[in-house]
Amino acid sequence: GSPGLIPFGRS
């Protein structure tokens, strides 16, 4: 997902 900032899409 996002580049480490927010765990968006990092299930």
From Swiss-Prot:
Keyword annotations from UniProtKB, A to Z: Amidation, Neuropeptide, Secreted
Coiled coil segments of this chain: none
Query: What is one GO cellular-component annotation here?
Result: extracellular region
Superkingdom assignment: Eukaryota
- GO terms under biological process: neuropeptide signaling pathway
State which tissues express it.
Expressed in abdominal perisympathetic organs and abdominal ganglia.
Keyword Secreted set for record = yes
Location in the cell reads: Secreted
Indicate where the modification Serine amide is found in the sequence: 11
Q: Which residues form the signal peptide?
A: none
Role played: Mediates visceral muscle contractile activity (myotropic activity).
Q: Which family does it belong to?
A: Belongs to the periviscerokinin family.
Query: What protein name does the entry list?
Result: Periviscerokinin-1
**Organism this protein belongs to:** Pycnoscelus surinamensis
